[in-house]
């Protein structure tokens, strides 16, 4: 998503190559879309998912971008869009019995959060 696709009152932050499957990240992003910054941060602090940590980092970065670059008040910011795209998949091999090898897939994802007033 380029800056030209953003509305005038929106800003974004992206974390790329996060070592987590995109479906596991989307499960949390669906819950915070449309919520205010403080409400989403409170929700992310107490959700029991591992994907909350990188999402909190991206959310704080998006809010810092809005505050520093555009001068917005952080109390009025709302999460407009939040999505996770699939990144490259790292392929590893696990040795098994009798000379066999099983393929292990380690997915990555790109997390994007758009905030606006």
From Swiss-Prot:
InterPro entries: Ribosomal_uL22 (IPR001063), Ribosomal_uL22_bac/chlpt-type (IPR005727), Ribosomal_uL22_bac/org-type (IPR047867), Ribosomal_uL22_CS (IPR018260), Ribosomal_uL22_sf (IPR036394). GO terms for molecular function: rRNA binding; structural constituent of ribosome. CDD domains: Ribosomal_L22. SUPFAM superfamilies: Ribosomal protein L22. It comes from the Eukaryota. Its main location: plastid. It is found in: Plastid, Chloroplast. The keyword Ribonucleoprotein applies. It holds the Pfam family Ribosomal_L22. GO terms for biological process: translation. One of its GO terms (cellular component) is chloroplast. Keywords: Chloroplast, Plastid, Ribonucleoprotein, Ribosomal protein, RNA-binding, rRNA-binding. This protein binds specifically to 23S rRNA. The globular domain of the protein is located near the polypeptide exit tunnel on the outside of the subunit, while an extended beta-hairpin is found that lines the wall of the exit tunnel in the center of the 70S ribosome. Belongs to the universal ribosomal protein uL22 family. Part of the 50S ribosomal subunit. This is Large ribosomal subunit protein uL22c. It comes from Emiliania huxleyi (Coccolithophore).
């Amino acid at each position: 998503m380029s800056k030209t696709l953003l509305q005038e009152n929106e800003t974004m932050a992206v974390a790329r190559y996060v070592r987590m499957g995109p479906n596991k990240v989307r499960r949390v992003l669906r819950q915070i879309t449309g919520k205010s910054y403080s409400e989403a941060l409170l929700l992310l602090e107490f959700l029991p998912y591992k994907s909350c940590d990188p999402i909190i980092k991206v959310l704080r970065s998006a809010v810092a971008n809005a505050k520093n670059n555009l001068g917005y008040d952080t109390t009025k910011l709302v999460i407009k869009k939040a999505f996770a795209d699939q990144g490259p998949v790292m392929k590893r091999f696990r040795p098994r019995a009798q000379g066999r090898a099983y393929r292990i897939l380690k997915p990555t994802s790109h997390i994007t959060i758009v905030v606006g007033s």
